[in-house]
């Protein structure tokens, strides 16, 4: 029973995706819950999974919660909070050993889905609100994470560039929320937001392991208590065009190394037929150590401590990040723009294309060895409403032509230049 694709169903408004396979010694369970990014909900929503991991109605104390995982032969439980396009995503993960390797009284897959369902839908409450001591502790945890961004100047500059570029868009928001909102959060108002979140989230539950779709549907139906059967779908916003004039932002801090970041707009997203071409184009521009930015800005000209580019296909944005000597701003900016212009003019070597395709191919092939990576690639398709199995992505990338790469690069338009510096410097 080794299938390469996911079988799909739906129960309680939850989309269920199962890959029956005996390849792995564990069950990989992943639950995605997405809601639109919004200023008034982003902070309480970010706090929710931190509170949920503290205890359930069945295991109200955190020590009991952790002991329950240990009793499932050391099952793992974790979560991430991040943004995907204009959505705030909360992803829960559980992994537990395959039943055939142990002699448990009850199916470990059933125990895992029951535990996850409990954690998400049946939290510990006091006076019809989240337990205040958990809210207080986790609020400080989130505060420290948000405050740590300013100490990591690479992350800080990347976030500030996006904030300036997307000033009136939800995408400007940090997925962990806003520091200014934390003090106003308590057990009552976060629980109120939790109830809305549980009812209105788009939910996708994945299982990879030695099971069947029918078994998982039955387990999810009985273990996930939800007041609604409505299945919400993601709505991907149409990418914006760059402004008529490039935004130029200079910010000063006590730093020794300048951070030059650039934001570009593209109409190409994951659902576009040109997606593979844009992926390869970004790889050639700045996605890998052999890219134009790395070899020319860093190695040949020695102008950057680091330099690279990142393509977000769920938003239609490409960002360029670099760390430079402050006095080299003009020269670095010119050479970065020169590399982009060369790519857009079709000045692309066979070596750049073949190396980039090889790097992407290796990443895709390696994903087949990880249940969670296979889940991640499949969810990309669910999110964008464009099914692209790994085999199809491999084929699409392999068949990209130099002309298609140039065409995908040519629609990149510079929107924002952000420079973090210590000097009075006009960008």
Question: Residue spans of the language-model regions?
Answer:
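His/Glu-rich zincin catalytic helix
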Residues: 1-73, 104, 178, 191-296, ...
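M16 family metallopeptidases and their MPP-like homologs
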Residues: 17-19, 25-38, 43-44, 62-118, ...
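Short, polar/flexible loop-turn hinges at active-site or ligand-entry regions and domain interfaces
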Residues: 55-58, 100-103, 122-131
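Acidic/histidine-enriched alpha-helical segments
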Residues: 66, 122-146, 234-242, 338, ...
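Short, flexible, solvent-exposed loop/turn segments with mixed acidic/basic and small polar residues
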Residues: 82-83, 191-198, 309-311, 406-410
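Glycine-rich, mobile lid/loop segments that gate access to catalytic sites or pores
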Residues: 142, 148-150, 161, 165
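Short, low-order "capping/linker" segments at domain edges
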Residues: 144-148, 245-256, 361-372
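Active-site glycine-rich loop that binds ribose-phosphate moieties when present
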Residues: 184-191
């Amino acid at each position: 029973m080794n299938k390469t694709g996911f079988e799909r169903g739906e129960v309680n408004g939850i989309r269920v995706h199962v890959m029956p396979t005996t390849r792995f010694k564990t069950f990989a369970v992943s639950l995605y819950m997405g809601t639109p990014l919004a200023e008034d909900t982003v902070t309480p929503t970010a706090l929710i999974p931190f509170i949920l991991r503290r205890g359930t109605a069945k295991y109200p104390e955190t020590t009991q919660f952790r002991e329950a995982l240990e009793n499932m032969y050391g099952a793992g439980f974790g979560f991430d909070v991040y943004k995907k396009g204009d959505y705030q995503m909360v992803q829960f993960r559980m992994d537990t050993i395959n039943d055939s390797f142990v002699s448990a009284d009850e199916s470990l897959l059933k125990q895992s889905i029951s535990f996850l369902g409990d954690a998400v839908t049946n939290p510990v409450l006091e006076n019809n609100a989240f337990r205040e001591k958990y809210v207080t502790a986790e609020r400080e945890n989130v505060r420290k994470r948000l405050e740590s961004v300013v100490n990591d100047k690479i992350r800080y500059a990347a976030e500030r560039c996006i904030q300036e570029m997307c000033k009136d868009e939800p995408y400007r928001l940090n997925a962990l929320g806003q520091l200014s909102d934390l003090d106003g959060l308590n057990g009552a108002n976060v629980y109120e937001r939790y109830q809305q979140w549980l009812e209105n989230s788009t939910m996708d539950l994945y299982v990879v392991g030695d099971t069947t779709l029918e078994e998982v549907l039955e387990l999810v139906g009985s273990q996930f208590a939800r007041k609604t059967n409505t299945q919400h779908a993601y709505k991907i916003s149409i990418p914006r065009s760059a402004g008529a004039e490039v935004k130029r932002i200079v910010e000063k801090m006590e730093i020794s190394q300048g951070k030059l970041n650039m934001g570009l707009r593209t109409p190409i997203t994951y659902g576009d037929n040109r997606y593979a071409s844009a992926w390869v184009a970004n790889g050639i521009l700045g996605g890998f150590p052999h890219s134009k930015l790395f070899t020319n800005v860093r190695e040949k000209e020695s102008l950057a401590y680091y330099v690279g580019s990142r393509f977000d296909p769920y938003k239609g944005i490409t960002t360029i990040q670099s760390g430079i000597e402050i006095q080299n701003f003009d020269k670095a900016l010119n050479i970065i723009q020169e590399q982009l212009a060369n790519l857009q003019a079709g000045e692309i070597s066979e070596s750049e294309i073949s190396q980039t395709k090889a790097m992407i191919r290796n990443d895709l092939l390696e994903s087949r060895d990880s249940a969670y990576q296979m889940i991640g690639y499949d969810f990309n398709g669910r999110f964008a409403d464009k099914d692209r199995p790994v085999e199809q992505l491999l084929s699409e990338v392999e068949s990209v032509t130099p002309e298609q790469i140039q065409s995908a690069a040519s629609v990149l338009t510079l929107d924002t230049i952000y420079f973090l510096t210590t000097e009075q410097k006009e960008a």
